[in-house]
Amino acid sequence: MPIGVPKVPYRIPGDEEATWVDLYNVMYRERTLFLGQEIRCEVTNHITGLMVYLSIEDGISDIFLFINSPGGWLISGMAIFDTMQTVTPDIYTICLGIAASMASFILLGGEPTKRIAFPHARIMLHQPASAYYRARTPEFLLEVEELHKVREMITRVYALRTGKPFWVVSEDMERDVFMSADEAKAYGLVDIVGDEMLDEHCDTDPVWFPEMFKDW
């Protein structure tokens, strides 16, 4: 079995024949991004850079962000969220597997009506945690104060984008809250459960494929 990133045939516009290129390069050309690991600085720079480039290249066509992540660094996740709100194209967020912690925050950041969870996906939200709990007391107190500010900011974003009262979101974030796709839709984290989208199109068009795959 081959090791590494799979290669697939892809015909670059203007070329007569297809060439073998990395799968991810093909997906990037189709404006499809993947967040499939813990959210760290390197991953954040990679995804935000692609979003900015794709926005410059085409400021109209949608971007698709697939998410299967356990979460990660607070500031890195906020950087992705802010970039999503800044670029001009609408961004679909699609959860497959799990979107936990900051990954659920990014899932929430997709364009309203374009946030999707696959039927067996799991979404989890909880309050931010500090990495400096072993610091000396003065440093720890400063960290707690800053963390409290960030927690309030994130809670307000959840409340605004889900339509839930601030106090409801704040209480829910006191613990790890896992949700199914249907529960996440009822909560307001996503707009569509994947099987609903498939059922809608399959009833009217048995050979339907997502728009982004039609030219393949």
From Swiss-Prot:
<dbReference type="GO" id="GO:0004252">
    <property type="term" value="F:serine-type endopeptidase activity"/>
</dbReference>
<dbReference type="InterPro" id="IPR029045">
    <property type="entry name" value="ClpP/crotonase-like_dom_sf"/>
</dbReference>
<comment type="similarity">
    <text>Belongs to the peptidase S14 family.</text>
</comment>
<feature type="active site">
    <location>
        <position position="126"/>
    </location>
</feature>
<dbReference type="GO" id="GO:0051117">
    <property type="term" value="F:ATPase binding"/>
</dbReference>
<keyword id="KW-0645">Protease</keyword>
<comment type="subunit">
    <text>Component of the chloroplastic Clp protease core complex.</text>
</comment>
<feature type="active site" description="Nucleophile">
    <location>
        <position position="101"/>
    </location>
</feature>
<protein>
    <recommendedName>
        <fullName>ATP-dependent Clp protease proteolytic subunit</fullName>
        <ecNumber>3.4.21.92</ecNumber>
    </recommendedName>
</protein>
<dbReference type="InterPro" id="IPR023562">
    <property type="entry name" value="ClpP/TepA"/>
</dbReference>
<dbReference type="InterPro" id="IPR033135">
    <property type="entry name" value="ClpP_His_AS"/>
</dbReference>
<keyword id="KW-0378">Hydrolase</keyword>
<dbReference type="GO" id="GO:0004176">
    <property type="term" value="F:ATP-dependent peptidase activity"/>
</dbReference>
<keyword id="KW-0934">Plastid</keyword>
<dbReference type="InterPro" id="IPR018215">
    <property type="entry name" value="ClpP_Ser_AS"/>
</dbReference>
<comment type="function">
    <text>Cleaves peptides in various proteins in a process that requires ATP hydrolysis. Has a chymotrypsin-like activity. Plays a major role in the degradation of misfolded proteins.</text>
</comment>
<keyword id="KW-0720">Serine protease</keyword>
<dbReference type="GO" id="GO:0006515">
    <property type="term" value="P:protein quality control for misfolded or incompletely synthesized proteins"/>
</dbReference>
<dbReference type="GO" id="GO:0009536">
    <property type="term" value="C:plastid"/>
</dbReference>
<dbReference type="GO" id="GO:0009570">
    <property type="term" value="C:chloroplast stroma"/>
</dbReference>
<dbReference type="GO" id="GO:0009368">
    <property type="term" value="C:endopeptidase Clp complex"/>
</dbReference>
<dbReference type="InterPro" id="IPR001907">
    <property type="entry name" value="ClpP"/>
</dbReference>
<dbReference type="Pfam" id="PF00574">
    <property type="entry name" value="CLP_protease"/>
</dbReference>
<keyword id="KW-0150">Chloroplast</keyword>
